Amino acid sequence: MSKNYHIAVLPGDGIGPEVMTQALKVLNAVRNRFAMRITTSHYDVGGAAIDNHGQPLPPATVEGCEQADAVLFGSVGGPKWEHLPPDQQPERGALLPLRKHFKLFSNLRPAKLYQGLEAFCPLRADIAANGFDIQCVRELTGGIYFGQPKGREGSGQYEKAFDTEVYHRFEIERIARIAFESARKRRHKVTSIDKANVLQSSILWREIVNEIATEYPDVELAHMYIDNATMQLIKDPSQFDVLLCSNLFGDILSDECAMITGSMGMLPSASLNEQGFGLYEPAGGSAPDIAGKNIANPIAQILSLALLLRYSLDADDAASAIERAINRALEEGIRTGDLARGAAAVSTDEMGDIIARYVAEGV
């Protein structure tokens, strides 16, 4: 690979900087093994940016992201900044504006039960034994969260509140294509989630997804009502590959997928726009209670890097190398404290070193 790539690195707050350090160790191993020309630039975001620049998303950070091929994001927030007005707090003042600025309309949340971690899965042992590897593809900018009209009116017994579920054809088409393209990189199956037996928006959703499916004859398509999907995820999550969801349904199902893995420290997330530009981050929070103690699990941040390589840099071999290295570490019983259950645990730094070494060795 001879192309030059540039990544904007935004470590953020809490455990963000220390887990980001581990991801950059792994990136260095990827650079060397695959002869990739990747440079990075660091920028403040969230609480760190408030402390250093007086605002959670400084113009220099936005400009740096604009000049990059992708953004590797840590985590933001913490008690230190909770006294600020909501729009000036790290989460709402940084992450949401970044998503809006770069028109990040799709969210990809993988949820995988790794071999050796079945005991952390809250499902029955016989179900957990089958394992699962699911990718939830959620539409981020349409649906009931943004549809108009919305509001409250009236008083007394006549007081009411209302929201409107609205989806346009182009919004459904583009998120469906993201799901089908993702399935092509995985096990070639898409399950589209809707409520087409009740909602007009879901009827349109199903019609358009069926149309897009004709462009992907190599991908199997199934439809499932949201209420059934929530049950099937508990009954047999191994049946799913890619879940295609509207904003509301994806909000619900992606969290359910996360919970059945048993550890938020293992879950990455990607938010993409139509040009393939993406923001990649762990699904968990900044965990200020363990920040600076060298005990945080860096795997979600490292897996976020793998998603970045796969979806924004089209470097699937490098992404797969990271995933294999993580699998090897877990198979060998290497655990940070959140997964140790009383057994010997490695530190944040040690886990990063081990995964980077395994990438370099090509395990």
From Swiss-Prot:
Record: residues binding substrate: R99, R109, R138, D227
Record site: Important for catalysis: Y145, K195
Signal peptide segment: none
Cofactor annotation: Mg(2+); Mn(2+)
Cellular localisation: Cytoplasm
Quaternary structure and partners: Homodimer.
Protein name, as recorded: 3-isopropylmalate dehydrogenase
Originating organism: Shigella flexneri
Gene name per UniProt: leuB
